[in-house]
């Protein structure tokens, strides 16, 4: 396929300035073979989508962990003070789980207005790891900001990687941020 593309480009006297792929391991070797001197970059949307998927997975696991802490209640109306307190706790935790599920998109949305920030704060109250996830997502979006140059983005990426390393639980979730192909996704920032 790439050989035919190169032939078609040369037949029309067109020049290939760059190639963008989805980050699959299938592309680099054939691209080097056919287009040796053409820069190859990774599509930023695929990387952000993978990070978003990991963040939503972390939100889901936090929600499941919260649901697991709900007290088990016997059937029927709670009669003792302890049973009533357990019922209130269960109702509160179930409401927080439902709110986390309903508003999970707020953890990965690029821009939040004031109302959405308040909702996110209310939903993630008592779960500092989720608040940290949102702060990290804002840094991820800042890395891919079109207004900065590649070197600035690489500096932001280094800062982001150091921040993620400080939180051991988040390090496993966001291991995509340590991928060596991530730097290749930032080459588009110097394009005019």
Stretches found by the model and what they are:
Residues 36-60, 64:
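Inter-helix linker motif
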């Amino acid at each position: 396929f790439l050989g035919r593309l190169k032939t078609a480009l040369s037949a029309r006297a067109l020049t290939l300035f760059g190639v963008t792929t989805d980050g699959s391991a299938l592309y680099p070797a054939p691209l080097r073979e056919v287009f040796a001197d053409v820069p190859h970059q990774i599509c930023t949307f695929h990387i952000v989508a993978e990070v978003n998927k990991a963040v939503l997975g972390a939100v889901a696991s936090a929600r499941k962990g919260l649901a697991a802490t709900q007290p088990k209640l016997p059937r029927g109306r709670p009669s003792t003070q302890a049973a009533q307190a357990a019922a209130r706790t269960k109702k509160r935790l179930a409401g927080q789980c439902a709110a986390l599920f309903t508003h999970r998109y707020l953890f990965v949305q690029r821009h939040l207005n004031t109302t959405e920030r308040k909702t996110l704060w209310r939903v993630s109250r008592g779960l500092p790891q989720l608040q940290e996830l949102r702060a990290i997502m804002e840094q991820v979006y800042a890395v891919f900001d079109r207004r900065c140059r590649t070197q600035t983005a690489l500096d932001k990426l280094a800062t982001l990687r150091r921040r993620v390393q400080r939180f051991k639980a988040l390090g496993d979730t966001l291991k995509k941020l340590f991928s060596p192909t991530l730097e290749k996704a930032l080459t588009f920032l110097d394009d005019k």
